[in-house]
Amino acid sequence: MSGDSSGRGPEGRGRGRDPHRDRTRSRSRSRSPLSPRSRRGSARERREAPERPSLEDTEPSDSGDEMMDPASLEAEADQGLCRQIRHQYRALINSVQQNREDILNAGDKLTEVLEEANTLFNEVSRAREAVLDAHFLVLASDLGKEKAKQLRSDLSSFDMLRYVETLLTHMGVNPLEAEELIRDEDSPDFEFIVYDSWKITGRTAENTFNKTHTFHFLLGSIYGECPVPKPRVDRPRKVPVIQEERAMPAQLRRMEESHQEATEKEVERILGLLQTYFREDPDTPMSFFDFVVDPHSFPRTVENIFHVSFIIRDGFARIRLDQDRLPVIEPVSINEENEGFEHNTQVRNQGIIALSYRDWEEIVKTFEISEPVITPSQRQQKPSA
C-alpha cells in the first residue's frame, strides 16, 4: 500500500495541479526583464501607436500569429512618408545654408532649389512639414534679396566718352585725329571739323523730329474776300412806350377818384336814410342788423356795413347796446356833435364787423328781415338788371 501510495503520489500531484497556474508561471519565466524606459515608452509613441486588439477579440490562426489591423498599417505608412519628407526638408535646408555662396554666384542654382522644394511641398499634409517648408522659404527669400542687390543699378547711366566716340565715328572723323586737332585749337582744320560735324549732326537729327506746319490765318472763305459789313439798322425810340406808361397812372388816378366819389355819395345817401327814419320816429331806436342787412343779397349787406363804418368814423352816427344787449344805431344831432368837438370828448371808432354767409342767413332768419332798409342805388341796380 505504501508502494502504491508512493507510486500514486507523483501522479496524484500531477493530476491535482492547476493547468492555468502552470501556463501563467511558464509565461512569466519566458518574459525577459524590461527597463523602466522601455516599459514606459515615449509619449509620442504612445499617442501615435494604434490600440492593440485584446486576446479575446483576436482569433488564433493556424500559425499562432495575431492578425494586424489595416488602419494601423496605413497609419504606419503615413508616418514613414512624413518622416521621410521631414528628413528631405532638413537635408535641403542644410544644403542651402552650407552652399550659400555658390547659390549667390551661380545663375540658376536658386531656381533649382526652389523647384525641389515645390516637389516636396506637394506631399506635405501635416503642420510639422509645413513649418520646415516655411523655414526654407525664409532662407530662399534672403538669397533672392541678396541676388537682387548684386544686379547693376546703373543700367540707364550715360557714358559720355562712348557717346563722343560714336558721334565722331558717325561724322566720319577718326577719334585719334580729332584729339590731335582739339589740342591745337588755332588750326583752321579744327573749325572745319566743328562746323561740318554740327551740320551732319543736324541733318541726322532732323529726321527724328516732326516738322511743324507754318501758321496761317483762316478767313472762312475760299476766295479770301472779307465779309461785307451789314448796314446798321437804327432801332425806333421808345418814346411812345414812355407816354403810355405815363398815361396809365393818370387813368388809375381818375378811376380812384371816381370810386372815391361814388363811395362818398353812397355814404351820404345812407346817412340821409338814417336821419329820415329818426326824423319820423325819434323815440324808437333802429336795430343795427335791421338797418344794414339786405335779405336778398349777401354782397350788398357787406357793402352796407362798409359804408356805415365811415358814418360812424366821422361821428355822424353811433352804435350802442340796448336792454337786450343787441346793437342799435342812431344818428348824432348837431348840438351833440358840437359839444363833443368843444370838449374834445368824442371818440372816433370805425365799426367794422366780420360776417360770414352762414351768419348772414341766421341773422335774416332770427330777426325776420323781409325787406332791406337801405334800398340799392341806381348804380347797383344796373349790373343786376
Swiss-Prot record:
InterPro entries: Nse4/EID, Nse4_C, Nse4_Nse3-bd
Biased composition (Basic and acidic residues): 10-21, 42-55
Disulfide bonds: none
Main location per the UniProt record: nucleus
Record's keyword annotation contains DNA damage: yes
Biased composition (Acidic residues): 56-68
Keyword annotations of the record: Chromosome, DNA damage, DNA recombination, DNA repair, Nucleus, Phosphoprotein, Telomere
Region (Disordered): 1-69
Any Pfam family the entry gives: Nse4_C
Task of the protein: Component of the SMC5-SMC6 complex, a complex involved in DNA double-strand breaks by homologous recombination. The complex may promote sister chromatid homologous recombination by recruiting the SMC1-SMC3 cohesin complex to double-strand breaks. The complex is required for telomere maintenance via recombination in ALT (alternative lengthening of telomeres) cell lines and mediates sumoylation of shelterin complex (telosome) components which is proposed to lead to shelterin complex disassembly in ALT-associated PML bodies (APBs).
Complex formation: Component of the SMC5-SMC6 complex which consists at least of SMC5, SMC6, NSMCE2, NSMCE1, NSMCE4A or EID3 and NSMCE3. NSMCE1, NSMCE4A or EID3 and NSMCE3 probably form a subcomplex that bridges the head domains of the SMC5:SMC6 heterodimer. Interacts with NSMCE3.
Entry GO CC: chromosome, telomeric region; nuclear body; nucleoplasm; nucleus; Smc5-Smc6 complex
Protein family (similarity comment): Belongs to the NSE4 family.
Protein name from the UniProt record: Non-structural maintenance of chromosomes element 4 homolog A
Residues bearing the modification Phosphothreonine: 345
GO biological process entries: chromatin looping; DNA damage response; DNA repair; double-strand break repair via homologous recombination; protein sumoylation; regulation of telomere maintenance
Subcellular location: Nucleus; Chromosome, Telomere
Entry-annotated residues carrying Phosphoserine: 377
